Amino acid sequence: MAKLDIIDRSGKTAAQVDLPESVFSAANDHLIYEAVINYRANQRQGTAATKTRAFVSGGGKKPWRQKGTGRARVGSTRSPLWRKGGTVFGPQPRDYSYELPKKARRSALRSALAKKHAAQELIVTSELELKEPKTREAAALIKALKLDSALLVDLAENANLFRAVRNLPRVKAVDVAGLNIYDVLAHKSVVFSRRAFEAVLEKLS
């Protein structure tokens, strides 16, 4: 069974943790692709809307009589053929979300973490606690760990961390329940506290 170093804030190895093969096996790239597409589809607002001829203001009166004028027959000034007319087949509000099976979602997250580990971009630290919810404290932590783009993962009770990183560019903090494949892949490094990493392993095993 492979092992991963647990580092402290100075970057020194403090302990090691086992990496179960059930989680860190070969990555399934197609499943990762499907999970990312699903995540992004579920994030869409789906509020784009255009007005068809039924909803454009005006156009209730027939512009001229049907026959006898020599002009083309027209029933409404809001025909899509006319200037200021309605839109044909334009977008309408809709729900883009769809369900991906829970097994597939978990397997995709396992694959994403396996790829991060293979690229040496998976980090486990002894703890991510901050004394105060201050941006400068979070920035000091990021600097000490020599990170640039990072996803920090800890338990929900670490409220100071979540508040402190809000103003840091390229850094995001989530709790274990909020961990998703898109955030894992969108950041160069994924940093777990030891307790969060153990919780994720238990969830994915």
Describe each region flagged by the PLM.
Residues 47-53:
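Short coil/turn segments at secondary-structure boundaries
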